[in-house]
Amino acid sequence: MAKDKFERTKPHVNVGTIGHIDHGKTTTTGAILAVQAAKGLAKAKGYSDIAKGGTVRDATKTVTIAVAHVEYESENRHYAHIDCPGHADFVKNMITGAAQMDGAILVVSAADGPMPQTKEHVLLGRQVGVPYIVVYLNKCDLVDDEELLELVELEVRELLSKYDYPGDDVPVVRGSSLPAYNNPSDPEASKCITELMEALDSHIPEPTREDDKPFLMAIEDVFSIEGRGTVATGRIERGVVKVGEEVEIIGLGPNSTKTTCTGVEMFRKEMNEGRSGDNVGCLLRGVKREDIQRGQVLAKPGSITPHTKFEAEVYCLSKDEGGRHTPFFSGYRPQFYFRTTDVTGTANLVGADMCMPGDNVKVEVELHKPIAMDDGVRFAIREGGRTVGSGVVTKILE
């Protein structure tokens, strides 16, 4: 367990890198760490450290899977940064990752321009509620034509506007991550990263934390620590959890379990409490490793209940957005992805005979397992591992 106390001196913001595979997301993350480390504001990490989390090789490259968490500071803020996987097959991680962002750095290779996954990630960002995007045009050193850069920038701005981001006002930083990663102390090489940090500080407002609401954390991972007990990790969605407080484990079964949180840690440092927006591990008294799983939530007792039936407003992705090619009808049985897990359920259309790709419809859903939910919670609709729609719970039925 952690030893150092976590110091809270600067406001805390969650960001992450999104964008097409091989456009340089992980290198950009490494460059930020290297440049900030040279200023004493971060610990540098190598590319392979950031890309770890199970790397699967395709024919030529190492495709980054899983979500890497790193931390660094700017002059004004403390950032927790996730390096989101860019590969279409790993959209599931993208969903768990993107749900954790106050803002995202959209990395686009200036040599290639926006690609299918660039679009997919912006769309996903819009769906899972990433409120702000800052654009980083990478590999500008490979493009010697100023007009081409202008063109790529225009293309990215149009793409953002299409998905309801303020495309005309979004900061676009031009740079090259590899030289900055290799020479972090060289002012010329690192200038683009300095500009990127300034853009993050100025364009992503300090998030209004939901500290005053009742505590809720979606469980992402569970592990046992010898002699200490069971730890559940995740991002605190709302509220505050203090060491010694009672919490409830809810979801994926009819019964909820009450337990006491006997320790909170963040980035291997012990804390007296965890607040909304923090990625923490909670040590739980008397809970066995097998009694708790990803997809459940930890919450203030009595503040949220598990449900299986609800009404929702659903958007079915169009074929061009990577959605279904055919309509669905009442009795449709996809997976519903809530917070950190997929649950199978049945959707029945309300006031419509069918839902075409690209349509918005009202549905009644019955899940096979109960999920902790309240009105306004968002979910993705998935088939065989790909996202075909997104929705928001409008009314809980039972």
UniProtKB/Swiss-Prot annotation:
Write out the ranges of the annotated region (G3).
Answer: 83-86
Where is region (G4) located?
138-141
Q: Name one GO molecular function term.
A: GTPase activity
Region of interest: G2: 60-64
Q: Sorted alphabetically, which CDD domains does this protein's record hold?
A: EF_Tu (cd01884), EFTU_II (cd03697), EFTU_III (cd03707)
Q: Name one GO biological process term.
A: translational elongation
One of the record's GO cellular component terms? cytoplasm
Function per UniProt: GTP hydrolase that promotes the GTP-dependent binding of aminoacyl-tRNA to the A-site of ribosomes during protein biosynthesis.
What quaternary structure, including any partners, is listed in this protein's UniProt entry?
Monomer.
What name has this protein been given in UniProt? Answer: Elongation factor Tu
Q: Which organism is it from?
A: Rhodopirellula baltica (strain DSM 10527 / NCIMB 13988 / SH1)
Ranked from the top, the taxonomy reads:
Bacteria, Pseudomonadati, Planctomycetota, Planctomycetia, Pirellulales
Encoding gene per record: tuf
